[in-house]
Design a protein with these regions (language model features):
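Solvent-exposed, non-transmembrane regions of membrane-associated and secreted proteins
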Residues: 20-261
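N-terminal Sec-pathway targeting helices
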Residues: 1-16
Length: 261
């Protein structure tokens, strides 16, 4: 009996050690991926210059490329400079850059041949579970579509699109109502008007709208918003939606929509 108990105890100990070893390896693997992802972005940090911090923070900004559209309040906006030539030497799939003040969102945007590849690959094309920020493959890379969508993971270390979660609070929206979208040809302000939790069955990721359908979609988005905005988009506007995971229920998503201006 004693021998049987010893064997049982030994077996349980072995199983426990195996579980602990696997858990430790899993934690190490996740942290290694996080580190590799963060290092990759550090390696390209010299390819974008952000505005200097001042006593009274200004909205994020970038020097406009030649021919960039003039914005009504551009004097209040300092546009960062992005070296797209250097970035595209790393990966020609890079189509834009997005920056949101008050978050860690300061990333290149890529576009693949589908919406799966960059879920598990960095902007460089290197495999990594953190993925990267990417434009829906159905969209025009120039953001000329009526509705463009960019995706990013909700990461435990606060990177990728975790920061858009903060728009669930009115106060954060009030302080950060605008994102900056920089492309090789034009700079855009993304003026947010709605943010809401969606299910995979929702039409939050619909691309092909008639004008009438788009008007209804815009109103529905505003009605569901976690925050109140004075912006009232119309059917002739171009909309950019930022999409990430959320955790209110299984397969929840948080989407943040803004007008391109």
């Amino acid at each position: 009996m004693k021998l049987k108990n010893k064997l049982l105890l030994g077996g349980l100990t072995a199983v426990l050690l195996a579980v602990m070893s696997f858990s430790a390896w899993k934690i190490w693997a996740i942290r290694s991926e996080y580190h590799a992802g963060e290092s990759a972005y550090e390696d390209i940090s010299h390819m974008i210059s952000l505005p200097q911090k001042t006593a009274e923070p200004q909205p994020p900004v970038i020097n406009k490329p030649a021919g960039a559209e003039t914005l009504p309040d551009e004097d209040d906006t300092v546009w960062p400079e992005v070296d797209f030539a250097a970035l595209r030497e790393i990966n020609p799939d890079i189509v834009a850059w997005i920056y949101i003040e008050g978050t860690k969102i300061n990333y290149p945007i890529v576009q693949g041949e589908d919406n799966s590849y960059y879920l598990k690959h960095l902007f460089s094309g290197e495999w990594n579970g953190s993925g990267c920020i990417f434009l829906d493959f159905r969209n025009d890379a120039s953001f000329a579509d009526r509705h463009s969508i960019i995706y990013g993971h909700h990461m435990k270390n606060g990177t990728m699109f975790t920061g858009i979660d903060r728009y669930k609070k009115q106060e954060f929206f009030d302080e950060h109502p605008v994102a900056l979208l920089i492309t090789p040809d034009k700079n855009y302000k993304v003026v947010f008007f709605a943010g809401y939790v969606a299910t995979p069955q929702d039409d939050a990721w619909e691309i092909g709208f008639t004008e009438a359908e788009f008007e209804v979609w815009l109103q529905n988005a505003a009605d569901r918003s976690c925050f109140t905005s004075e912006i009232a988009p119309i059917a002739s506007d171009r909309i950019l939606t930022l999409s990430t995971c959320s955790y209110e229920f299984d397969d929840a998503r948080f989407v943040l929509a803004g007008v391109l201006r």
